[in-house]
Amino acid sequence: MSLSEGTPERLVLLGAGNVATHLGRALVASASSAVRLTQIYSPGGRSARALAEELGEGISAVGSLEELDLDADWYIFAVPDDALIPLAKELAGRVRGLWVHTSGSTSLDDLAEVHRPAGVLYPLQTFSKGKALDFSEVPLYVEGTDSEAEGRILRLGELLSRSVARTTSQQRLVLHLGAVFACNFSNHLIAVAEELLTRHGLPEKALLPLIDEMTAKLHTLPARQAQTGPARRGDERTLRRHERFLASEPELEHLYSLLSRQIRERSERG
């Protein structure tokens, strides 16, 4: 059935964290007559109530599975990965509809073993509740247990974003792994750099112009070509000086040496 036909399909959002918050905002902002967010669940209900109040009238908030709407058309699991399958198993046999998870690292098969039809709607973005973003620019990656389920999820995705594509669970895992390297690890390294600066009386955000230029270059150059710095140049004198400076912090010294060696080896391979 097309999402554009008939009465609006009811959607229950399981979760009220960062991903669920932005997904809920996008669902409401789409103002679609095809699908309507009707209920939000979070354990205890506090986060669900806060999100439901933000999103407006007509959305109920519940804090226990006993209060859940059992006859909705959609159940979207926007919960931490380690909570996803345990929650699904609690709902097994109690609710029908199309079950969809938003995890990058969880296989579709894991959810499909609990319930069918099932699918995935994975938003490839970093989300924080307090930071607004344009969800229509967020790439969405879709998978379904069958062509009908996948088609419905694709159409839902197209209501929310301009960038929607099919992927397998294996491809999605690679995307998620790449995101951890590109986003999570790089953010951690920036946090390390900020702490280093503040400990030595320098402004925490002194590196922002450098970071902005680095990310801007990635829109036009492959990351390997955009690489700069002493390891890329083979500047052993500077590398040794930095390592001596970090001698009192062996973990940071090891991290610096490991990353420098990898940069140098990749540069030498061309």
What are the functions of these language-model segments?
Residues 23, 47-54, 58, 111, ...:
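Internal alpha-helical scaffold of NAD(P)-dependent oxidoreductase catalytic cores
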Residues 11-13, 77, 142:
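Hydrophobic Val/Ile/Leu positions in short beta-strands of Rossmann-like dinucleotide-binding domains
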Residues 1-63:
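NAD(P)+-binding Rossmann beta1-loop-alpha1 motif at the extreme N-terminus of oxidoreductases
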Residues 212-270:
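Interdomain hinge/lid region at the active-site interface
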Residues 21, 25-29, 53, 89, ...:
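Short, well-ordered alpha-helices that flank and scaffold nucleotide-derived cofactor binding pockets
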Residues 41, 76, 179-182, 186, ...:
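Amphipathic, non-transmembrane alpha-helical scaffold segments
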Residues 41, 45, 49, 54-132:
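Rossmann-like NAD(P)(H) cofactor-binding subdomain of soluble oxidoreductases
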